[in-house]
Amino acid sequence: MALSQSVPFLATELLLASAIFCLVFWVLRGSRPRVPKGLKSPPEPWGWPLLGHVLTLGKNPHLALSRMSQLYGDVLQIRIGSTPVLVLSGLDTIRQALVRQGDDFKGRPDLYSFTFITDGQSMSFSPDSGPVWAARRRLAQNALNTFSIASDPASSSSCYLEEHVSKEAEALISRLQELMAGPGHFDPYNQVVVSVANVIGAMCFGQHFPESSDEMLSLVKNSHEFVESASSGNPVDFFPILRYLPNPALQRFKAFNQRFRRFLQKTVQEHYQDFDKNSVQDITGALFKHSKKGPRASGNLIPQEKIVNLVNDIFGAGFDTIATAISWSLMYLVTKPEIQRKIQKELDAVIGRGRRPRLSDRPQLPYLEAFILETFRHSSFVPFTIPHSTTRDTTLNGFYIPRECCVFINQWQVNHDPQLWGDPSEFRPERFLTAEGTTINKPLSEKIMLFGLGKRRCIGEVLGKWEVFLFLAILLQQLEFSVPPGVKVDLTPIYGLTMKHARCEHFQARLRFSIK
């Protein structure tokens, strides 16, 4: 009797489970775009219903997707939740998409986390990719170049960047000497991040930048609260229910963006109080001046309230990536002291000890330049670009890609592709030198992916490369970096928009000589 009662109950359960399975199957099938005749969809590995491939991505999506690309090719599709995501690997494929078909792939997906960056109006993160966006991007690029890498007629330095970096590098050397005389050790990232923030702050705001204020120091030293949630594949962007559950990382991200925006708004407003259009001294002043002219219809005129959004993007372009690059460089140098000695030998031979390095010395310091390139490649600390999206239906490598498809660009895979590098796991700066060892192999150096490509390429790329070079040249000319014997330096990247290394508080710096 009991058995006969349980049979209908079991049948009901099976029927319900079958109905749910069919519903999920048809929902997922219905969400797939219709592929035009003669084309095919990108290959897609098996994924869990409702979850997709989120479990496969794990804590290091760049590694998981690189392994997938070996099996499925340079163009593949995954699902995070029910959202299809196109994943591009391989340098040729990425160049085809972002450069040759740049208009098709220049969009940004409308992701939940992006709405908290400058209230959803960030030039870098917002979905906008129309004429107004393009005009403001050009304006931001021109303002950044004018007050960073363009010549400075009022200074003995070759440009504003050289003037500010030289000043901050010397201040950093003095600060490190004080730390060595006191505690006897330091955390390199904590020190470098302040110096880099002061450089971009001076270029953005001139004398109005609150250098070393408690508020500024708190923001720059906690920038990890931004990068951990702005990374590609953040589950909160694909599973709406996570927005309503306890999420400490998301709360930190929201709070950081609010604090950073208030900080910039306050600094921009104070700057505007004594703005003189006949004496523009910094990036924000250039934006103020531009907001007073230009036909509105063309998108060249910036409303005053939008200036802080551009400043936010420019500050970001000239801050986190550069600080992370310098910090990674120092980590490699203490683990490979023979490379540090070769760089210092080159600096001594080319520059000597009577003056500081300048940007004009860059062509004569190929080994230092090769070391920087290898740091960019080996660390690949920007594993993905900010996600792209397609602006219209298109094809790539024979695959049909629908409009508004989210696209991940795997820069890490390009920088560790054995077909490009032969021995990608080895840290070998010499790979970027010509056979004579006197110049950089330019075609090979252009295969590194760190700043993106095409219409969304980072506007701070040139600034970043120049600034990293000059900071390292000045620091390594005067200081020798090391860690005590027995101290292990962990070079395992921590995944994020920019990947940081584990903090090392045992750095030491010995003064080689000083320049008055």
UniProtKB/Swiss-Prot annotation:
It is a peripheral membrane protein. InterPro entries: Cyt_P450 (IPR001128), Cyt_P450_CS (IPR017972), Cyt_P450_E_grp-I (IPR002401), Cyt_P450_E_grp-I_CYP1 (IPR008066), Cyt_P450_sf (IPR036396). This is Cytochrome P450 1A2. One of its GO terms (cellular component) is endoplasmic reticulum membrane. Glycans are attached at residue 69. The keyword Metal-binding applies. Keywords: Endoplasmic reticulum, Fatty acid metabolism, Glycoprotein, Heme, Iron, Lipid metabolism, Lyase, Membrane, Metal-binding, Microsome, Monooxygenase, Oxidoreductase, Steroid metabolism, Sterol metabolism. Belongs to the cytochrome P450 family. It is found in: Endoplasmic reticulum membrane; Microsome membrane. It comes from Macaca fascicularis (Crab-eating macaque). Its cofactor is heme. One of its GO terms (molecular function) is steroid 17-alpha-monooxygenase activity. Substrate binds at residue 226. Its EC number is 1.14.14.1, 4.2.1.152. GO terms for biological process: arachidonate metabolic process; cholesterol metabolic process; estrogen metabolic process; hormone biosynthetic process; progesterone metabolic process; retinol metabolic process. Heme binds at residue 458. PROSITE patterns: CYTOCHROME_P450 (PS00086). CDD domains: CYP1A (cd20676). It catalyses: an organic molecule + reduced [NADPH--hemoprotein reductase] + O2 = an alcohol + oxidized [NADPH--hemoprotein reductase] + H2O + H(+); 17beta-estradiol + reduced [NADPH--hemoprotein reductase] + O2 = 2-hydroxy-17beta-estradiol + oxidized [NADPH--hemoprotein reductase] + H2O + H(+); 17beta-estradiol + reduced [NADPH--hemoprotein reductase] + O2 = 4-hydroxy-17beta-estradiol + oxidized [NADPH--hemoprotein reductase] + H2O + H(+); estrone + reduced [NADPH--hemoprotein reductase] + O2 = 2-hydroxyestrone + oxidized [NADPH--hemoprotein reductase] + H2O + H(+). Pathway: Cofactor metabolism; retinol metabolism; Steroid metabolism; cholesterol metabolism; Lipid metabolism; arachidonate metabolism. A cytochrome P450 monooxygenase involved in the metabolism of various endogenous substrates, including fatty acids, steroid hormones and vitamins. Mechanistically, uses molecular oxygen inserting one oxygen atom into a substrate, and reducing the second into a water molecule, with two electrons provided by NADPH via cytochrome P450 reductase (NADPH--hemoprotein reductase). Catalyzes the hydroxylation of carbon-hydrogen bonds. Exhibits high catalytic activity for the formation of hydroxyestrogens from estrone (E1) and 17beta-estradiol (E2), namely 2-hydroxy E1 and E2. Liver. PANTHER family: CYTOCHROME P450 1A (PTHR24289:SF21), STEROID 17-ALPHA-HYDROXYLASE/17,20 LYASE (PTHR24289). Interacts with PGRMC1; the interaction requires PGRMC1 homodimerization. It comes from the Eukaryota. Induction: By 3-methylcholanthrene (3MC).
